[in-house]
Amino acid sequence: MIYTCTMNTAVDLFVETDELLPDVVNRTKDEDYQPNGKGVNISFMLKRLGLDNTALGFTGGFTGRFIENELLNEKIVTDFVEVEGISRINIFINSTREFKIVNKGPLISEARKQELINKIRQIPPGRFLFISGSLPRGVPDDMYLSLSEIAAENKLKLILDISSPVLLDCLSYHPYLIKPNEQELAAFFSRKKALSEEEIIHCGKELLDRGAERVLISRGKDGALYLDRQRTLKATAAKGKVVNTACAGDAMLAVFVGKQELGCSVPEALRHASAAGSLTAFSKGLGDVSKLDQTASQIQITHL
């Protein structure tokens, strides 16, 4: 069984309009509501690959019920901690440019935080645990450290996709895999300019030296890089019209891990992972897994 943990679940509202103007009523051409949060996205993608998983985290209010119902509709097991308030609503506007409006999330009490910690302590050894995304109000960054320590103690395969600089401290617990994007990677190492490919690889190797077992770096239109202690691989991206980049990294991560669980080699899993990221970028929500093989045929893998 695979477990995902999303501490700041969300409902994402995707809207499309010809243009977005100030001080007037902007009418949309299309709208779509999607259950979201990085771990939630990963749960959907894993299930669509045929992999059972359990979704953990915090949910609240009518939005929380929507998120949980959508997961249950796809036969995904849920074990959320219900909190006061409502799970946040984020807005993504596709106009002449892409706009992203992301809210903070509900305030989490100490009791509810401890309840989630206790659920994670009960995960059997050897299982995958994805900890992904931001933290809601009331949950300090050291929560990532606490959960990383529990994962190490319980011999879980910990996968981290977080933008907090605390990630660097979590590396001492030797996570199975981490997935920064280029911007996060630059921020972790206090680089103010965009990184060259050579610099990205250097930073990725530094993360390995600090304790990560594997590093997957999502690069948008430039595909992805994968590093472990034996190899460095580069994947291109597929070509298409970008609609929404919000969930592409989540799809990439889920498919990279999921395909290996289904027996694929690392290079083949990376090929499909890059395809999943591209398909999602070309969609309003998560990419269609039925198109994975066809899209993966466009992806080139290079050993660096």
From Swiss-Prot:
<dbReference type="InterPro" id="IPR011611">
    <property type="entry name" value="PfkB_dom"/>
</dbReference>
<dbReference type="Pfam" id="PF00294">
    <property type="entry name" value="PfkB"/>
</dbReference>
<dbReference type="InterPro" id="IPR017583">
    <property type="entry name" value="Tagatose/fructose_Pkinase"/>
</dbReference>
<dbReference type="GO" id="GO:0008662">
    <property type="term" value="F:1-phosphofructokinase activity"/>
</dbReference>
<dbReference type="GO" id="GO:0005829">
    <property type="term" value="C:cytosol"/>
</dbReference>
<comment type="function">
    <text>Kinase involved in a D-tagatose catabolic pathway. Catalyzes the phosphorylation of D-tagatose-1-phosphate (Tag-1P) to D-tagatose-1,6-bisphosphate. Can also use D-fructose-1-phosphate, with 40-fold lower catalytic efficiency, but not tagatose-6-phosphate or fructose-6-phosphate.</text>
</comment>
<keyword id="KW-0547">Nucleotide-binding</keyword>
<dbReference type="InterPro" id="IPR029056">
    <property type="entry name" value="Ribokinase-like"/>
</dbReference>
<keyword id="KW-0418">Kinase</keyword>
<dbReference type="GO" id="GO:0005524">
    <property type="term" value="F:ATP binding"/>
</dbReference>
<protein>
    <recommendedName>
        <fullName>D-tagatose-1-phosphate kinase</fullName>
        <ecNumber>2.7.1.234</ecNumber>
    </recommendedName>
</protein>
<feature type="active site" description="Proton acceptor">
    <location>
        <position position="250"/>
    </location>
</feature>
<comment type="similarity">
    <text>Belongs to the carbohydrate kinase PfkB family.</text>
</comment>
<dbReference type="InterPro" id="IPR022463">
    <property type="entry name" value="1-PFruKinase"/>
</dbReference>
<keyword id="KW-0808">Transferase</keyword>
<keyword id="KW-0460">Magnesium</keyword>
<keyword id="KW-0119">Carbohydrate metabolism</keyword>
<comment type="pathway">
    <text>Carbohydrate degradation.</text>
</comment>
<keyword id="KW-0067">ATP-binding</keyword>
